């Protein structure tokens, strides 16, 4: 069976945006204009086709990235919906891995907002080419040129408008296409229609010329050939301009900008044309890196030939077909009814049915080809980030990094009978979302759930009720504290026991040194002359690692330490791995007590947007919460306050902020780094922990 769409004509794109930039509406209109969904879902009524989970409908925010296939001008576009809320950055990271290009949607009034910066950073990290769509041009205060400045100054990118708006706010009529120098006008506001090409209005001729010159300059810098032609005063042909824009877009040296209003159906068709013209096909992006079990690196080229290799990037539970695993095929093809090899887990998986998803309908298919995205039904052991490959070529594609959770709460089912249902539900949800963890508190026996923020955990509890019919009581949020040391110390420890027959003997000298924040744990073997035989060294490492689980101050995990074993002794008969493990563990604990141990807490980057009248109250309140105000800006007549605040002080912040500002301020918060807790607060934490 051969493929219906050639690889060159496949586009895997995501629509990434800040929470209210109109991302879902833009996705909806794309699906509408590509002829897949006939009634446009409006987010305001909570009926968008992409937002297929109940809570999203209520909250009006998009949570899970669903992959949807649609067609435009004989190209297959796989649309991966990415969430716009900070607590779901893991979802964004995950979709960035499998995208080849992105459409960044900005609100023409709000411009570059904090979440847009986070999403932009992630797109830079994965080298994703993108085009910008400035949406909501019909809103009061719409300003295309402001957004252009913000992209340049805040995101440090090089925006190149390919269109400029005709009018703004209520007078927004359409756009001037700077490539063809034609005005594209939408004459009917109420229903989706095609645009009409007209001559450029006289009052905009000069501005259009100025912006076209800027565009041509940017394009000419993408190759020596075009530069020579441009400097020689020759006109660039239409084809050359388009090739130059694409080259600049793929090398991330330029970001093409378009504008419109998705809600009023203006500007969507030219956006689709730009996706097809300027965003990359799967074989136009860098090959994905992989490695074999022995560590040899390999580069995996996107092609139908060669052994199958794909990445499972998302797991969802579907009420009708059970568990769906979304897979992006990088090489070869995947057939339903065949077998694939999970090279991350070393397990064989049977491929059941294969589905191409439309946001809420599904089409059964026989084969997924290179560059395509689809869902597999019935995989047993495959989790997010696992590689599926052929048994003949067990490549492991580069793994995804998932952040550690920063907040935990205890959950208990309302009725004892629900205990088992609750653990099944939580395990299913943890499979879907690698940034969500479930554990049991050893002392109290309570079930603890941990995640990236309050909203993240609220939604988990909500999904337990809706999807699994388990009602849960939720405890007080707990912060994920850590411990570390501040001084370098050397510590000797001898573990020797003699109780009839064979004794136990382990003797180590350890050096404990503080590392830079975020470095984790480093172990160094500096034993000379075999004073400790090398078969015992792993036991020393293991002993230290066990001691790291419970710090000496309040029993929190210890991080950012380097431990060197540099001397010691052993006994021919009595030494054992166990003895060295215990010596290292106790030696580390003793050393840590002298090494200036401190408690660390997660610091959140908080951005509050508030009318000026309330600014004093907001800053005063942040200071009360031990926050450090970092910067103050203005945006659209409001004040923007950026601060670092300890997570421990931020519980219930949304309610407090609402009452301080009569509901007129908004905020966003994401984890930034760990920082030392002030002594008085640390004493309280220790007292509480140690009873």
From Swiss-Prot:
Keywords: Cytoplasm, Elongation factor, GTP-binding, Nucleotide-binding, Protein biosynthesis. GO terms for biological process: ribosome disassembly. GTP binds at residues 17-24, 81-85, 135-138. Gene3D superfamilies: 3.30.230.10, 3.30.70.240, Elongation Factor G (Translational Gtpase), domain 3, P-loop containing nucleotide triphosphate hydrolases, Translation factors. One of its GO terms (molecular function) is GTP binding. Pfam families: EF-G_D2 (PF22042), EFG_C (PF00679), EFG_III (PF14492), EFG_IV (PF03764), GTP_EFTU (PF00009). GO terms for cellular component: cytoplasm. It comes from the Bacteria. It is found in: Cytoplasm. Residues 8-283 form the tr-type G domain. PANTHER family: RIBOSOME-RELEASING FACTOR 2, MITOCHONDRIAL (PTHR43261:SF1), TRANSLATION ELONGATION FACTOR G-RELATED (PTHR43261). Belongs to the TRAFAC class translation factor GTPase superfamily. Classic translation factor GTPase family. EF-G/EF-2 subfamily. Catalyzes the GTP-dependent ribosomal translocation step during translation elongation. During this step, the ribosome changes from the pre-translocational (PRE) to the post-translocational (POST) state as the newly formed A-site-bound peptidyl-tRNA and P-site-bound deacylated tRNA move to the P and E sites, respectively. Catalyzes the coordinated movement of the two tRNA molecules, the mRNA and conformational changes in the ribosome. This is Elongation factor G. It comes from Campylobacter jejuni subsp. jejuni serotype O:2 (strain ATCC 700819 / NCTC 11168).
């Amino acid at each position: 069976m051969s493929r219906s769409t050639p690889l060159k004509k496949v586009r895997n794109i995501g629509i990434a945006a800040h929470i209210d930039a109109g991302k879902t509406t833009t996705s909806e209109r794309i699906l509408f204009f590509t002829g897949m969904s006939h009634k446009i879902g409006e987010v305001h009524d909570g009926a968008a086709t992409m937002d297929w989970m109940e809570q999203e409908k209520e909250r009006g925010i998009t949570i899970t990235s669903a992959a949807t296939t649609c067609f435009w001008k004989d190209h297959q576009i796989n649309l991966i919906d990415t969430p716009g809320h900070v607590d779901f950055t893991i979802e964004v990271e995950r979709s960035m891995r499998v995208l080849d290009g992105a459409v960044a949607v900005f609100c023409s009034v709000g411009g570059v907002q904090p979440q847009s910066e986070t999403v932009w950073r992630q797109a830079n990290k994965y080298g994703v080419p993108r085009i910008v769509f400035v949406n909501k041009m019909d809103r009061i205060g719409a300003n295309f040129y402001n957004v252009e400045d913000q992209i340049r100054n805040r995101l440090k990118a090089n925006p190149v408008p390919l269109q400029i708006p005709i009018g703004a706010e209520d007078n927004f009529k359409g756009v001037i296409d700077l490539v063809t120098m034609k005005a594209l006008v939408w004459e009917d506001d109420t229903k989706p229609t095609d645009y009409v090409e007209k001559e450029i209005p006289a009052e905009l001729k000069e501005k259009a010329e100025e912006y076209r010159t800027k565009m041509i300059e940017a394009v000419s810098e993408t190759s020596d050939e075009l530069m020579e032609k441009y400097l020689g005063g020759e006109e660039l042909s239409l084809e050359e301009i388009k090739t130059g824009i694409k080259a600049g877009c793929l090398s991330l040296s330029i970001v093409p900008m378009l504008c419109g209003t998705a809600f009023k159906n203006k500007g969507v068709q030219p956006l689709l044309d730009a996706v097809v013209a300027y965003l990359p096909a799967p074989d136009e992006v860098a090959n994905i890196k992989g490695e074999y079990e022995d560590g040899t690196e390999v580069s995996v080229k996107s092609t139908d030939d060669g052994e199958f290799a794909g990445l499972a990037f998302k797991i969802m539970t579907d009420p009708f077909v059970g568990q769906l695993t979304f897979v992006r095929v990088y090489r070869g093809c995947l057939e339903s009814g065949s077998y694939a090899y999970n090279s991350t887990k070393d397990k064989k998986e049977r491929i059941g049915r294969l589905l191409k998803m439309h946001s809420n309908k599904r089409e059964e298919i026989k084969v997924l080809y290179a560059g395509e995205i689809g869902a597999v039904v019935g995989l047993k052991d495959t989790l997010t980030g696992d590689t599926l490959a052929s048994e003949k070529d067990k490549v492991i594609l580069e793994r995804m990094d998932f952040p550690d959770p920063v907040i935990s709460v205890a959950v208990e089912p309302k009725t004892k009978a629900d205990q088992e249902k609750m653990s099944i539900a939580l395990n299913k949800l943890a499979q879907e979302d690698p940034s969500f963890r479930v554990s049991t508190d050893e002392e109290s026996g309570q079930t603890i759930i941990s995640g990236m923020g309050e909203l993240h955990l609220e939604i988990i509890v909500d999904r337990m009720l809706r999807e699994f019919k388990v009602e849960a009581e939720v405890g007080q949020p707990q912060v994920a504290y850590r411990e570390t040391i501040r001084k370098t110390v050397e510590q000797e420890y001898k573990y020797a026991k003699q109780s009839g027959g064979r004794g136990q003997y382990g003797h180590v000298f350890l050096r404990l040194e503080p590392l830079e924040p975020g470095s984790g744990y480093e172990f160094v073997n500096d034993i000379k002359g075999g004073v400790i035989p090398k078969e015992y060294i792993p036991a020393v490492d293991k002993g230290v690692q066990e001691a790291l689980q419970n710090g000496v101050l309040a029993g929190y995990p210890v991080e950012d330490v380097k431990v060197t074993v540099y001397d010691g002794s052993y006994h021919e008969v009595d030494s054992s791995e166990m003895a060295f493990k215990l010596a290292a563990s106790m030696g580390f604990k003793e050393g840590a007590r002298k090494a200036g141990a401190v408690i660390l807490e997660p610091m959140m980057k908080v951005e509050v947007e508030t009318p000026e009248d309330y600014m004093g109250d907001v800053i005063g309140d942040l200071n009360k919460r031990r926050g450090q105000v970092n910067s103050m800006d203005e945006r659209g007549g409001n004040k923007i306050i950026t601060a670092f605040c300890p997570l421990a002080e931020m519980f219930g912040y949304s309610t407090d902020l609402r009452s301080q500002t009569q509901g007129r301020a908004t905020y966003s918060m994401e984890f930034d780094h760990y920082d030392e807790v002030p002594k008085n607060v640390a004493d309280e934490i220790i007292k509480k922990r140690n009873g």
